[in-house]
Amino acid sequence: SYALGDGDAPLRAVRVTAESRGLLAEILSPWGAGTLRVPLLGRFNLYNALAVLGSLCMSGVTLGDALAALENAPAVPGRMQRIDVAGAPLVIVDYAHSPDALEQTLRALREHASGRLWCVFGCGGDRDRAKRPLMGRIAWEHADEVLLTSDNPRSEDPQAIIDDIATGIPAAGARRECDRAAAI
């Protein structure tokens, strides 16, 4: 088993630090101790890294080699995926498509943010309309700036979807740009 922090699990990550480039943690394990650096964002990814670390070590890979391998772990495309552009702010793409997923994503990113946290998002068309205002409220509560845009409207009017989302945000509280490319 594995865990974050103190406890009885044989594999533990302690002194966890969220940095703009990823996560840093001290590892305590039956195979020794070491420093884990993963270029992944969000503490949930630390649980994934611990699972991989334990599997590798139980398969005979040394702790040092396993830690080195995880330093280059790629993000799953569309899931807390970094878009690095020299001289530009840190941009993350995530497929958060439910209120809970959006909230967890923004909470995770807040730990890594060193400046203002922007949320550029939209809701898909022909899907649960009731969640749109809720997602707007969550974005408003957890981001410093919110920009509403189109996201696969299907048969719906993109502006109507944005208007639905905006009902969960205080008046004039979010920017709007229907053209997704322009919004990004």
Language model feature labels by segment:
Residues D6, D84, C178-D179:
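Short loop/edge segments at beta-strand edges and connector loops
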Residues L23-A25:
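Short aromatic-glycine-enriched beta-strand elements
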Residues S20-R21, P30-E145, T167, A172-A174:
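Nucleotide phosphate-binding/pyrophosphate-handling subdomain across enzymes
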Residues L148-D163:
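Redox- and metal-dependent alpha/beta enzyme cores, enriched for Fe-S-associated oxidoreductases
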Residues D6, G124, S150-P153:
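Short, ordered loop/turn segments at secondary-structure junctions
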Residues R175-D179, A183:
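Short acidic-hydrophobic, aromatic-tinged amphipathic segments that line or gate anion-handling sites
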